[in-house]
Amino acid sequence: MTNEYLAPFVDELFNLGVREAVFSPGSRSTALAMLFEEYKKYDTYVNIDERSAAFFALGIAKANRRPVVLVCTSGSAAAHHFPAITEAKTSRIPLIILTADRPAELQFVGAPQTLDQTRFFGNFVNHFENLEAPQPQAKNFWTYPRKVAQRAFLSALDQMAGPVQINIPLRDPLVPELKSENYEKGRSKLPFKFFKGQQSASFDEALLSSKTLILAGANSSENYSESLLKLAEHLKAPILADPLSNLRNHNSPFVMDSYDAFLANDDLKTDLKAESILLFGQMPVSKRLQQFIALNDDAEFIQVDPALAYRNPSLTTTITVQSNVATFANSIQKVNQDFSYLEKWQKAQEKMRHQLEKVAQEENPFEGRFVQELQKHLKALDAQLLVSNSMEIRDIDYWWKKEDSKVRILGNRGVNGIDGTESTALGIATTGKPTVLLTGDLSMLHDLNGLIIGKTHELNLTIVLFNNDGGGIFHHLAQKGVPNFDYLFSTPHGLNFEGLAELTGLDYHLVSNYADFGQQFETSIRQPGIHLLEIKTDKDLSLALHKKYTAYEN
């Protein structure tokens, strides 16, 4: 049946604390009404008028101070909810509005009771999401609806409580096959929970008695590094430090910097499995780390975020804590005395780091060694380094090691695009601190006009450009070797960056070797103006050298 995935959605909302559901009769919403009613645990109410139904649900939520489900069919039905939704938003009353909808193939073709219900209530809801039917063979067929329910519930109870819209396109047959066992499918072994602020103190015993792993992503919170280092020391937990977390500025025994390389080893992945995982900030860039997290599907996954934002694409989060990092870290008072799990990570880290350091002997032009050279020349400076997306942030993830330093690494990892890098770097440069942009050729071409403002306002920036003549990242991905690979993905352009530098008024230098890079970098970082240091590399050679230096041997 096309709508059986909704049974876990109904079950999850009840597990989270929803107890009431209000319906208005309709055909497209048949499955929702029947599944809520058949569940037998909800107090359900039917109101023939959608406007009245919405205010009725508002009254229940207002009295009980908890979210109430409000269901309507497709078409104009949702429009009748609007007055109550505006009241709920301004009064901060939590409602979860489920708008049944026609599927995509019936949109914009004159189908009856059909209009565009995307973000139908505009700014009057805290959150909007489409709950599409997952592919039947998808691994997350039963878990995905539960995660949508969790996001809806948390958004309704955010710091400013309010209504949430979940739009649900439904296909025929509309009458569901009612199987009681479907309600239980996709349930986590560890039921989803959420906590606020000081409630996190209840984690003391659970975290101290388990193999705990800390994931540190990009985060702008004050005292972020200090708080996580303190927490790691209490828990004896390794910190997998994304370069944008800036925890690699601390040569701490708790900080791991080479995990993306050694997590390619299957034996290690099994041996390093965690029982509790703590996520702070954005999910780290490492794809292998995300694959490792998915393997730990029986671990307690605790996400700590002041806004209750959902930042785990592996869909394994079991606990969300609404707290800043410092408050959570300070709530863990006891000290773990067991170093065994930490020592396993330290052993793998040390072995992998020794292998990665061998790149210092490489004489061919290779991004890995140039990153290490860049770190060496930046170490003594109170500098800022913006890293572009695609391969450059991954090069930093692999090759930037932990050491005591003041270099602040930044990146646009919100939506991970390759545009706007020069403009962002020049905005960062307005602080007056030494500023460096590490970018690739395609990223730089996307924002050449951004250099104009740097000339206009006489800003200082050193650009380190890895030019491999096209999309080098695709040589590391599944597209490598497909028909028309160069034309469709690698996209060699053959452009002359010296000419582009002359056009935009940059001070230009083509780097000839590693020693030349060091000399030119030391000069440019101390001189005013915008400087471009171009490093030409070969995509195929870089791929071969990457495999050579990142291989973890048992």
Curated annotation (Swiss-Prot):
GO terms for molecular function: 2-succinyl-5-enolpyruvyl-6-hydroxy-3-cyclohexene-1-carboxylic-acid synthase activity; magnesium ion binding; manganese ion binding; thiamine pyrophosphate binding. Its EC number is 2.2.1.9. InterPro entries: DHS-like_NAD/FAD-binding_dom, MenaQ_synth_MenD, MenD_middle, THDP-binding, Thiamin_PyroP_enz_TPP-bd_dom, TPP_enzyme_TPP-bd. It comes from the Bacteria. Coiled coil: none annotated. Binds 1 thiamine pyrophosphate per subunit. Keywords: Magnesium, Manganese, Menaquinone biosynthesis, Metal-binding, Thiamine pyrophosphate, Transferase. Pathway: Quinol/quinone metabolism; 1,4-dihydroxy-2-naphthoate biosynthesis; 1,4-dihydroxy-2-naphthoate from chorismate: step 2/7; Quinol/quinone metabolism; menaquinone biosynthesis. GO terms for biological process: menaquinone biosynthetic process. Its cofactor is Mg(2+); Mn(2+); thiamine diphosphate. The keyword Transferase applies. CDD domains: TPP_PYR_MenD, TPP_SHCHC_synthase. It catalyses: isochorismate + 2-oxoglutarate + H(+) = 5-enolpyruvoyl-6-hydroxy-2-succinyl-cyclohex-3-ene-1-carboxylate + CO2. Catalyzes the thiamine diphosphate-dependent decarboxylation of 2-oxoglutarate and the subsequent addition of the resulting succinic semialdehyde-thiamine pyrophosphate anion to isochorismate to yield 2-succinyl-5-enolpyruvyl-6-hydroxy-3-cyclohexene-1-carboxylate (SEPHCHC). Homodimer. Belongs to the TPP enzyme family. MenD subfamily. NCBIfam families: menD. This is 2-succinyl-5-enolpyruvyl-6-hydroxy-3-cyclohexene-1-carboxylate synthase. The lineage of its organism: Bacteria, Bacillati, Bacillota, Bacilli, Lactobacillales. The gene is menD.
